[in-house]
Structures are given as C-alpha cells and as structure tokens.
Amino acid sequence: MALWRTNDSKVYLPPAPVSRIVNTEEYITRTGIYYYAGSSRLITLGHPYFSIPKTNTRAEIPKVSAFQYRVFRVQLPDPNKFGLPDPNLFNPDTDRLVWGCVGVEVGRGQPLGVGLSGHPLFNKYDDTENSRFANGNDQQDVRDNISVDNKQTQLCIIGCAPPIGEHWATGTTCKNVPVPQGDCPPLELVSTVIEDGDMVDTGFGAMDFANLQATKSDVPLDIAQSVCKYPDYLKMSADTYGNSMFFHLRREQIFARHYYNKAGVVGDAIPDKAYIKGTGAGRDPISSYIYSATPSGSMITSDSQIFNKPYWLHRAQGHNNGICWNNQLFITCVDTTKSTNLTISTAVTPSVAQTFTPANFKQYIRHGEEYELQFIFQLCKITLTTEIMAYLHTMDSTILEQWNFGLTLPPSASLEDAYRFVKNAATSCHKDSPPQAKEDPLAKYKFWNVDLKERFSLDLDQFALGRKFLLQIGAQRKPRPGLKRPAPSSSASSSAKRKRVKK
C-alpha cells in the first residue's frame, strides 16, 4: 500500500511503490482431503535447576524445568511425493501440493502441582514489607535460603517458522567507550529465536542474568546463569508473511508475595532534595532502596487449562492461514501448572538404621514432562504462475528449490573431460568438487525434532482428534463393513399377488 510522506524539502514526492502482501487464501486451492497425524508420547527428564556434567560413573543429566520453553519442530512428509487417493488431483507440471494445518491438540500428562525454585544464598537484605528497623550494616553477608513459587504461565504458539523472543541484554556505548568498572552498563532490547530449553520469564523479568547480575544470588538458581526470554508478540504479529505465529494461546498469573531490598552499595544515590535526612542508627545513612519482590503464581486449577483441548484454525492472525511451508511446523509450549519436582532419597548404607540420621541419606531432585501432539492437515494445491513463483521466491527461495524449480542450462556441444578417479594422488586436483548436501538453515538452533513423515492417516474416525474434527465439520463416519446385512433390493419383490376377479 503506497502512502504519501513528507520530507525536508518543499516538494512532496510519492514514495516508491510497495509490493502488496497477499493472503495465502488468494493463491491456494483447498481440497476436501484431510489427514490425521500424531506423535508418540514425548517424555523428558532431568534436573530442574541446572545440568549435571558427565562423570566416570554417571552420564550427563540435562536441565529439565517446567519454566523452560518446549519448541517442537514437526517434520511433515512432502505431499508432492505422497500416495494420494486421487491421482488426478493435481497436474505436476503446473501445480504443487502443500499442507494446511486446520486442527491441533497439545496433550499434557502428569498431575497439577507447584514446583518451587530458590537460592540457598539469596540476596535478601531487609524485609521491606514488615520492617521493624533497617539493618544499617551492609558489610556482612546477610544472604539467606529463600524459595519461591514462580509466575504461572501457560503458552502455546503455532507457526511454520521459529518463534521470536525478546530480553534485555548488555548494550554498547555510542563511541565504544568502555564503561567504568562498577558503573551500570547500557541496556539493549534484543530479539532472538526462542530455542528448546530457553528459560521463560519467571517473575523476575526478561533479561540476561548471567551478564547483568554479578552477585549470582539476586534471582533463583535456575535462572541465575541463564537468559529469560519473553515472546515478542509485537514482532511476530507484525511478521510480513505471518509465518512465525498463526495463532497463540496465553495465560499468565502472578502476584507479589514478599518484599525485600538488595544488599550492596547503591550505585545511584537518592538526591538530597528527595528526602529529609534522619538521625540514629539505620537512618543515617539510609538503607538501600533497590527493592525486589518474590513472585507467586497463586492457585492452580484444572478449570484454567489451555492444553488437552482441540483448536480449529479458520482464519489466522497474519497473512499465512495455516500453510506449512517447507513441510514443517513449530509448536512452542510452556506449562508451569505441572511443575512438581520429584524428591528422591537413597540410603548411604545397605542397612537402614532404626533411628533417623540425616547423614545416612542422600537427597536428589528431578523433574519430568510429558507431551503429545495431534494434528489435522488439509491437502492444498497451488497453481504456479509467474507472479506466484516470484512472490514465493521473495518470501523464501528454498520453497521453489524443494519443488525442483530452477534454471535448466542447455546441453553443451563441446567435449568435456570426465575423470574416473578424482580424489587420488595420481590425478590432478579438480577445483570443481561435487555439490554437497544442502545445509539446514536452522541447524544452529536447538529444537525438539518430531518426525511425522510416516504417521499420516486418512482414517480420521480411528483417532480421537479425527472424530472431533468430523463432528466439527458435520461429516459422517465411514460405515464399517460386515456389521449389518445389506437391505433387500426393492426390485426383488415377494411372491406375486393373485389378481382378484369380480364375480
């Protein structure tokens, strides 16, 4: 859409024309063929606060927390190489097939529960909620063992591109002048890809705690050396092609439980005109005003669950109405309502004593999660015209490459050399090496890969989500053969009736 804009000169010139972004429904034809696809039970287990490195007697234990993002990269089969029920459905010379996601259900196992997080040496100075008097001595180590129930979050983002998150990180000065030691560094809002295992906002903000908190004790253990990301809804909603987020489900809940301030020297002193100086211990000098609250997610109920429910996609929030480009789908999930941490105790000696002694037992903690993904996909067709191919190439050039569209060179009339053994010491070096396999552009990111290439089925009535979808569209189930005898044909009449003759 072209808009007029003003400039510094006195003459107003129209802006350069901008290509129009079209909705996928304008160039995609939807067929009446639907497929069901579902994953197996997806389980992960590990330590909820940090990863434990590998030792000689034990394998590495990963970090698995309820406050991590679970980003599933769902791999779909190529519909152009799929065995279709109707071979005349499309013309391979002019058409291509794509998948359209019309239904999804994310299943969650395990019971509801609250998993605590905390720090054995939490930077807690004064109780500023019920303070009797300020400590007045910030030279001693007054850190304490504090645990909290973090912010409650349920989140599900559906798209065909990786989700985008935002967080506060260390910025740079304008002239690259180093920040003096002890001064507050400049901050910058950074947008990055959300990967599987990244930490969510637990109530302490979305920031790079590893680089912005040198005490390593201002937040709980699970995020003290991590980066907490918050979904960048503004950027994903403004995505030009709408691939990052077809739609999303979100529920957040938090309140402040306790109020503290931080121990340490206050970097930015309060102006003298902002208060009247006090007298006595603890009031002159005044205590720290760096206040911080411990969050709480409050009560958890099954009435507020967004998972284990089917969702039908009729109209996406962006221009992509559920089309799975590159035969992939990204499901981003967060569910802190099932954050129970499993505490495990083992005896140090084979024989357990009759009296309890803490030194005779070892305590461990683990956290496990359980997911299941189910989808309903609709087979869609694209008629490739010159305009559509140019549009798709602008959006993502790899789409046409996967469809084997490219420039075909004319056959050469000259005689060329072809060596049998190319890589050996007797043959001269050949610079033109054979083409390597194409690299995955998302290989540098970490996702939970779910392969559904062999899990598609046309029998929707054999699956729970498929039956719900058939009920949604008003379609009838396929009759099961052999359960009833066929009704007799109307042409096969019983014995012929006699014609009554009047006397």
Curated annotation (Swiss-Prot):
Keywords: Capsid protein, Disulfide bond, Host nucleus, Host-virus interaction, Late protein, T=7 icosahedral capsid protein, Viral attachment to host cell, Viral penetration into host cytoplasm, Virion, Virus endocytosis by host, Virus entry into host cell. Signal peptide: none annotated. One of its GO terms (molecular function) is structural molecule activity. GO terms for biological process: endocytosis involved in viral entry into host cell; virion attachment to host cell. The keyword Plastid does not apply. Forms an icosahedral capsid with a T=7 symmetry and a 50 nm diameter. The capsid is composed of 72 pentamers linked to each other by disulfide bonds and associated with L2 proteins. Binds to heparan sulfate proteoglycans on cell surface of basal layer keratinocytes to provide initial virion attachment. This binding mediates a conformational change in the virus capsid that facilitates efficient infection. The virion enters the host cell via endocytosis. During virus trafficking, L1 protein dissociates from the viral DNA and the genomic DNA is released to the host nucleus. Self-assembles into homopentamers. The capsid has an icosahedral symmetry and consists of 72 capsomers, with each capsomer being a pentamer of L1. Interacts with the minor capsid protein L2; this interaction is necessary for viral genome encapsidation. Interacts with protein E2; this interaction enhances E2-dependent replication and transcription activation. This is Major capsid protein L1. It comes from Human papillomavirus 82. The gene is L1.
